[in-house]
């Protein structure tokens, strides 16, 4: 497990990082209850249980915590939507189905510090009056599944789950559910269908999950990092949380730095930090190379170039620059990377993972792949570039969920910034890039030669 927070915090005079969730990832057995309690674990829960549920929701709302799964919707407001006194059971579902290319923050968090999530779940369930919560985990990550099961067992044994938690009268059952590997189940309503035992496909909304979610009952669906951030807010205070980040995007978050960089890993910092600052503190791009393009929030967000190095990485800053913060998956590519090749691979992923429910997404992603493969192989025509734009435009905003939008984003942005590179594939009858040079071992191979 790589953690860079402690090292950089000690050596960087600006102290740009804000390790909270990742503060003790580098300790031995950081995932255990004993280590978590040494770092004030479950103290936030004690303070939460001393508040009335409605006051707790208002407190989280006032903290300014926004969803960390991509959309950035205020967490407290989502909790507030749950109707009270309706006589129905309420559910909390944690979306841990992290599957998008480049997105890799929730899995390390669950692996290194699962109790932060469990504590956050208990707090959230107390707030929304829920007695049953679920963690929907991506099925392929079996080591994380085992670690989660062990953490849940520890929490039950210590009285943080089960009946009459800490003498508060709160009863809570927590179920860990492993998905079957479908990316579409990361969409909240498809996730609920999957959890109910049906094929994962997005639902028509309204009704929204807050009214009719799991088993047609009021349900809150939150991201792992969103819920795991709640205990620190309760323990250290909303003013402490708001002292970090920006006015409209307060607090800390995990940035996943990957690609052609010298120091890939999870960097926990206040919202509003820039990629330039993150690269400066992590060693920059790999030696001898320069940044060509990057994604601010995973493959589903419009790409940026080196012109955007100083864009504040918060919801407003990235949005104003023409993209989305998304999951803060900062994939960085240097000048050896073929944009057409990268976009083709991403589009192949979306075509494969489309559930097929919506015709624009099902058919559109298929035809995008056919055109991109032809262009990459040197068989394309100039008219194909406008055709790519047209097909992407017919997908964007015309499906039940955002998978189609995610497939269209790289098409629009790559043609905007790198149209000449597409044209070079067509006029030059093939890709001018050597794929081997963009591999992690390319420079080592050249040195040996």
From Swiss-Prot:
Cellular component terms (Gene Ontology): respiratory chain complex I
Cofactor(s) required, per the database record: FMN; [4Fe-4S] cluster
GO biological process, one term: cellular respiration
Top-rank taxon, per record: Bacteria
Reactions accelerated catalytically: a quinone + NADH + 5 H(+)(in) = a quinol + NAD(+) + 4 H(+)(out)
GO molecular function: 4 iron, 4 sulfur cluster binding; FMN binding; metal ion binding; NAD binding; NADH dehydrogenase (ubiquinone) activity; quinone binding
SUPFAM superfamilies: Nqo1 FMN-binding domain-like, Nqo1 middle domain-like, Nqo1C-terminal domain-like
CC cofactor note: Binds 1 FMN. Binds 1 [4Fe-4S] cluster.
Keyword terms, alphabetized: 4Fe-4S, Flavoprotein, FMN, Iron, Iron-sulfur, Metal-binding, NAD, Quinone, Translocase
SMART domains xrefs: NADH_4Fe-4S
UniProt: NAD(+) binding residues: 67-76
Record: residues binding [4Fe-4S] cluster: 355, 358, 361, 401
Binding site for FMN: 179-226
Keyword Metal-binding attached: yes
EC number: 7.1.1.-
PANTHER family assigned to the protein according to its UniProt record, in alphabetical order: NADH DEHYDROGENASE [UBIQUINONE] FLAVOPROTEIN 1, MITOCHONDRIAL, NADH-UBIQUINONE OXIDOREDUCTASE FLAVOPROTEIN 1 NDUFV1
Its job: NDH-1 shuttles electrons from NADH, via FMN and iron-sulfur (Fe-S) centers, to quinones in the respiratory chain. Couples the redox reaction to proton translocation (for every two electrons transferred, four hydrogen ions are translocated across the cytoplasmic membrane), and thus conserves the redox energy in a proton gradient.
Family: Belongs to the complex I 51 kDa subunit family.
Name used for this protein in its record: NADH-quinone oxidoreductase subunit F
Protein's organism: Streptomyces coelicolor (strain ATCC BAA-471 / A3(2) / M145)
């Amino acid at each position: 497990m790589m953690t860079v927070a402690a090292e950089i915090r000690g050596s960087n005079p600006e102290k740009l990082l804000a390790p909270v969730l990742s503060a003790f990832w580098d300790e031995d057995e950081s995932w255990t209850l004993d280590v978590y309690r040494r770092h004030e674990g479950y103290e936030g829960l004690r303070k939460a249980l001393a508040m009335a549920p409605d006051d707790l929701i208002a407190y989280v709302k006032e903290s300014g915590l926004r969803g960390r799964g991509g959309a950035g919707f205020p967490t407290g407001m989502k909790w507030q939507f749950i109707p009270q006194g309706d006589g129905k059971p309420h559910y909390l579902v944690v979306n841990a189905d992290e599957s998008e290319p480049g997105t890799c923050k929730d899995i390390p968090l669950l692996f290194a510090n699962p109790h932060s999530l469990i504590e956050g779940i208990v707090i959230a369930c107390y707030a929304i009056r829920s007695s049953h919560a679920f963690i929907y985990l991506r099925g392929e990550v079996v080591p994380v599944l085992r670690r989660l099961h062990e953490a849940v067992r520890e929490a039950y044994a210590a009285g943080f789950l089960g009946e009459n938690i800490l003498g508060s009268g709160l009863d809570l059952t927590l179920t860990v559910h492993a998905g079957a590997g479908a990316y579409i189940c990361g969409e909240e309503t498809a996730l609920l269908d999957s959890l109910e035992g049906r094929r994962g496909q997005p639902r028509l909304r309204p009704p929204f999950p807050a009214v009719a979610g799991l088993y047609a009952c009021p349900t809150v669906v939150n991201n792992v990092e969103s819920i795991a951030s709640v205990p620190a807010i309760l323990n250290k205070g909303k003013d402490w949380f708001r002292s970090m980040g920006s006015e409209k995007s307060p607090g800390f978050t995990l940035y996943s730095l990957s690609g052609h960089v010298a120091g890939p890993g999870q960097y926990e910092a206040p919202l509003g930090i820039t990629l330039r600052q993150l690269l400066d503190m992590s060693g920059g791009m790999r030696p001898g190379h320069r940044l060509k393009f990057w994604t601010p929030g995973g493959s589903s967000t419009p790409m940026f170039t080196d012109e955007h190095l100083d864009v504040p990485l918060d919801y407003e800053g990235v949005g104003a620059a023409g993209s989305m913060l998304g999951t803060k998956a900062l994939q960085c590519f240097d000048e050896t990377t073929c944009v057409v090749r990268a976009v083709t691979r991403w589009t192949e992923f979306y075509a494969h993972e489309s559930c097929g429910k919506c015709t624009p997404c099902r058919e559109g992603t298929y035809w995008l792949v056919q055109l991109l493969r032809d262009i990459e192989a040197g068989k394309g025509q100039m008219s194909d570039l406008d055709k790519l734009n047209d097909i992407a435009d017919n997908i964007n905003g015309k499906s039940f969920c955002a998978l189609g939008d995610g497939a269209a984003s790289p098409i629009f942005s790559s043609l905007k910034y790198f149209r000449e590179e597409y044209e070079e594939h067509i006029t030059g009858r093939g890709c001018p890039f050597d794929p081997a040079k963009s591999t992690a071992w390319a420079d080592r191979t050249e040195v040996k030669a």
